[in-house]
Amino acid sequence: MSAKPKILTLGWEFPPLYAGGLGPACYGLTKALGKYVDNTLVLPRHEKKFKVRNVTIIGLNHLVSETSKIQTRKIDSLFSKEINWEEELFSSYPLTLPRKAIRQWSEKETKQQITKSERENLFSEKDIYGSNILKKVSAYTDMVRELADDIDFDIIHAHDWITFSAGVQLKHYTRKPLVVHVHSLETDRVHPQSRNRVYEIEKIGMMHADRVLPVSNFTKRCIMNYYGIREEKISPVYNGYDSDFNVKRAGQKFASSNREKKVLFLGRITAQKGPEYLIETAQKLFAKMDNVKVCIAGTGDLKPHLEYLVRKSNLQDKIVFTGFLDKERVKKLLSETDAYIMPSVSEPFGLSAVEAAQFNIPCVISKQSGAAEVLPNTLQADYWDTDKMANYLFASLNYKSLSDTLTEKTQVNLKDINWDIAAKAVLTNYNFLLN
């Protein structure tokens, strides 16, 4: 064995193809691990021009057209005998699939074979998720299994449920230890009592894993409570953040007490993020002060419903929807923001709150989040306590001494959040398994 552990990393999102928080997290950790391990990363789709130092990246979108080694086979999960197909709601990053989609997949596509041309189409699609996500997961699992014969590795590291099936197959085929990294859970995305196809893949993946790495203690508790995984093999690893975010503030806060203030929500507009609690909080804030607007940045399946609620309440002039924003526009918006709100119902980490803290923005966040653990000097409330959320926002916007104290202390917290710390924590788990 070389001085550096050899890691086979199974990923799904990676720059420049992002759909949610999984991509930035995998990129940050993989990049930081580069100086500690020899890393081979397998992705369903990758742009060859995007490279990471000390990391070998394999994009299946290139392999399907270059090799005849990968054989077609019936789509049949490793766990087919352990999973009951049900007509129910389940999540597909970054949105939820309707019941019709999962029913059609389970009744028809599981009985088909994936041909070479289908593989080429699957991994050439710009949408790396989509309604055919389970078909992509099955094809990814098959191809990773075949590729493993030509890759030298000591440990398998699988990121989130979409790669867990491949990770478990490789573990039993190679007898190499498996690490699964949990960035989000089906019980976060759909409901704590969700027991569907994705939930079963997550549970079986964690049961077969040698180490389970959730992104927070909040997620660790969810894994234990909802999935029944033993505590002794769970080791939380907090995410880092992009420290090269080029933070610039636009103007001075509190320059005028009459200036219109801006409250920001940044993220996917899905049930997991608590958007209806956001609207309720905003209404209570507007009752306390008039010179404030709420900006909702992002998109998601509940965006039309939220827009309807805003129209119904006649708040179109007070609540603004921006839609999807690229990184530069996000930075500009953060530079103009006076307070940040994250009312998530179940948030494994909450990178957007960390990004807001970088901009010296006082943050009001849900207690049901990983960010609450790494940013203890934010104002925190239960997601359903909209009275407290509104009061915290009002105080942050109107009391300069409070705002300054919160942001100064949060800057200290940020020093303990970086990808190198995360990489060293992951390396400790690797060494534990190898020794």
What are these regions (language model features)?
Residues 213, 256-282, 295:
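Conserved donor-binding/catalytic core segment of Leloir-type glycosyltransferases
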Residues 218, 240:
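Carbohydrate-associated surface elements
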Residues 345:
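Aromatic "clamp/platform" in nucleotide-sugar-dependent glycosyltransferases that forms part
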Residues 362-365:
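Short hydrophobic beta-strand element within catalytic cores of glycosyltransferases
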Residues 378-387, 395-400:
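Conserved acidic donor-binding segment of nucleotide-sugar-dependent glycosyltransferases
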